[in-house]
Swiss-Prot record:
Name recorded for this polypeptide: Non-specific lipid-transfer protein A
InterPro entries reported for this sequence: Bifun_inhib/LTP/seed_sf, Bifunc_inhib/LTP/seed_store, Plant_nsLTP
Disulfide bond positions: 3-51, 13-28, 29-74, 49-88
Signal peptide location: none
One of the protein's GO biological processes: lipid transport
Keywords: Disulfide bond, Lipid-binding, Transport
Organism, scientific name: Ricinus communis
Family per similarity comment: Belongs to the plant LTP family.
Keyword Transport listed: yes
Length: 92
């Protein structure tokens, strides 16, 4: 998994993640779906998680509740927590 792909998948989610808008855009949700496609294995999900953590650290205004609700709001069942504090190595 390449962090550039992960970052570009989630870039359109920044307005939602920082609380600028109340719900994620269609392009944001398409990115979440794409992220699921990019990470089919446990190792891929752990790598994607590390990318997400690194990206989240660059955006101190990301709201944790928005981040954790993103997959559900998009209707995507993804096994990668979107958080600044996830222990990525614990992901299966």
């Amino acid at each position: 998994v390449d962090c550039g792909q992960v970052n570009s998948s989630l870039a359109s989610c920044i307005p939602f993640l920082t609380g600028g808008v109340a719900s994620p855009s269609a392009s944001c949700c398409a990115g979440v779906q794409n992220l699921k496609t990019l990470a089919p294995t446990s190792a891929d999900r752990r790598a994607a998680c590390e990318c997400i953590k690194a990206a989240a650290a660059r955006f101190p205004t990301i709201k944790q509740d928005a981040a954790s609700s993103l997959p559900k709001k998009c209707g995507v069942d993804i096994n990668i927590p979107i958080s600044k504090t996830t222990n990525c190595q614990a992901i299966n």
